A protein has these predicted regions:
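TRNA-binding/sensing appendages of the translation machinery
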Residues: 1-83, 138
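Beta-rich nucleic-acid/ligand-interaction surfaces
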Residues: 44-60, 161-171, 252-260, 348, ...
């Protein structure tokens, strides 16, 4: 076996991609900060009791597990930031009003989450806690769109759903308790033959006409009427140039802990969603404090692959000399934001690899960029 081979769907990030990802990370986190979102950094490892609290079986299956050599307890490598950020909000911050939090870090999945996905995404996202009104959902969807635009994604298609509709219908299905997981995945995968009485949901996807069809074809239940109204209002308030909005009533969320409105963003050239989010009001309950919550997450690696290529790095090659004036000139250039690379002796034949388009040379007694 070749020792340099990596596991399937695990890849190194090389300099050009890493530079693009870092530019995006800084730009998006700056955008979040400008909207009042505070950065948090949960640990990569936690005991599974807290890491998986309040989540569904899908997240459990996606989580790598190992035994802690210090305590003997089972630990998990996070597969999603949301439960961790919910724990921070509920147990550590303990704020009474609205909390706006954001994050960026690696997660690890036992299997890829999509056709083009890696098993080690770098998640970046934002979450809003403490407000149950539609205003919170509007804010995070608009922020998600703004983040995608900041990443250079010109065309965005938003798919809206609401699992509350599925749950209201499932309660009236006699076999639902015994077939809960089977029904959930049948609807999510649009398998009408396995969805039984819920099969109608698999056909309700498309433009604004879907809401009117749903009002005609779905049971006349107050919860369903309210959920459809929320979808309609959210779509209206998130309309923007370059953004298309559609509805998918079979969209039930990512890891099966969404409790209300869900949304996913797509763009031409990517078969998988480039951002996902939704309501998850009950995740904090296992930490003793259920709070209204909504948010979204994106994969920096995926965004970097779709975003326009960043400008080619421009650098200045400086000689490796012990001279105070040279060192001062290099320091001034770096302070001004220039990249200055020292030309170490013995590597003259490999200078092209340094990607320097200018030189720092001494002319008429002064160090100048040429």
């Amino acid at each position: 076996m070749r020792r340099w081979l990596l596991p399937e769907h695990i890849e190194d990030v090389l300099p050009a991609e890493a530079r693009a990802m870092e530019r995006l990370r800084r730009a998006i986190l700056d955008l979040f900060e400008a909207h009042g979102y505070e950065l948090v950094a949960p640990p990569l490892l936690e005991y599974v009791e807290s890491l998986l609290s309040g989540t569904g079986r899908d997240l459990d299956l996606a989580t790598f597990k190992l035994v802690d050599q210090l305590s003997g307890r089972m630990m998990g490598v996070r597969a999603d930031h949301t439960p961790q950020v919910a724990r921070i909000d509920a147990h550590l911050l303990n704020r009474q009003g609205v909390a706006r939090l954001c994050y960026c870090g690696s997660v690890l999945h036992t299997v890829p989450a999509g056709m083009t996905k890696m098993r080690e995404p770098i998640q970046i996202g934002a979450e809003l806690y403490g407000h149950e009104g539609l205003e919170a959902d509007v804010e995070v969807v608009r922020l998600m769109i703004a983040a995608l635009k900041r990443a250079g994604i010109a065309r965005v298609h938003i798919d809206l759903g609401n699992p509350a509709i599925y749950r209201a219908m499932a309660q009236g299905e006699p076999s639902a308790p015994e077939r809960a997981e089977e029904l959930f995945h049948a609807v999510q995968q649009k398998d009408a033959s396995a969805a039984g009485a819920l099969a109608v949901l698999t056909t309700l996807n498309g433009g604004a006409e879907v809401i009117e069809r749903a009002r005609r074809e779905l049971p006349k239940l107050p919860r369903i009427a309210e959920a459809l109204g929320q979808l309609e209002r959210l779509a209206r308030r998130c309309a923007a140039p370059g953004v298309e909005v559609s509805f998918d009533l079979a969209e039930l969320g990512g890891f099966n802990y969404e409790s209300g409105l869900t949304f996913a963003a797509f763009t031409p050239g990517s078969p998988d969603a480039i951002a996902r989010g939704g309501r998850y009001d009950e995740v904090g309950a296992s930490f003793g404090r259920a709070r209204p919550a909504t948010g979204f997450t994106m994969d920096l690696r995926q965004l970097a692959a779709l975003a326009p290529a960043p400008p080619v790095r421009r650098a200045i090659l400086a000689p490796a000399l012990e001279e105070a004036a040279l060192e001062e000139a290099v320091a001034r250039l770096r302070e001004a934001g220039e990249v200055v690379v020292v030309d170490l002796p013995g590597h003259e034949g490999a200078r092209a690899e340094l990607d320097c388009d200018r030189r720092l040379e001494k002319k008429e007694g002064k160090w100048r960029v040429t």
